[in-house]
Amino acid sequence: MLTMREVTKDGFGAKVRDWNKTALIEQWRERWADHVNRALAERDIDARIDHRSLEAQGIALEPQDKIGPAASRIGGRGLEAERIEEHRAIAQRNGERIVANPALALDALTHQQATFTKRDLAAFVHRHSDGKEQFDAAYNAVRSSPDLITLGKDGRGQDRFTSRAMIETEQRLHRAADTMAQHTDHAV
C-alpha cells in the first residue's frame, strides 16, 4: 500500500493525482503480470495470469468483485450487503452462461493454464455460479462437454484435463514447428 500524498520535509503534501491515471494503473498491472508470469515459468508452473479484462481476453463472462471472508460473514448490512447481492446476481448470470455453453469455462481455464484438475474446475465453477444447485448444473455441464479432454493422471495421481480447443492449438503449433524444421532456407 502506498500513500497518494507526497512526503516533504514539512510532512504530507498534496495528493499525487498522476497515480490515478488509468494508463499508469494499466501499465503497473501489465508489468506485475509479466513479473509473476516470469516467476511461474522459472519454476515450471503451468499457470499464467492475465492483467486484461475478461472482455479483452475474449472470455464471455461478467467480471465479479471479490467478496472476502470478512464481508461474507457480516453479510446483511449496508453497502457490503449490496455488493454481496450484486456479486451473487453476476455469479447467477455467469452460471447460466456456463450451463448453456460449457466451452466458456473450458476456454477461461485453459487461458490461464494448459491443463487443469477437477479441483481447478470446481473452484472456477464455484466462483462463477450461485448456490449448490447451479454449481452442480454448471459443473456437470462442463464435465459432460464433448470439448473436455481427459489427459490422464499427473505425478500426484490427480486426473488432468484440457479442452479440445487447446489440443487443436497445440497440434497447429506442432505442425508449424515441423514445417519450419523442414525448411533450411528461412531466416531467423
Task: Name each model-derived stretch.
Residues T3-H174, T184-A187:
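Single-stranded nucleic-acid nicking/binding segments centered on His-rich, glycine/basic loops
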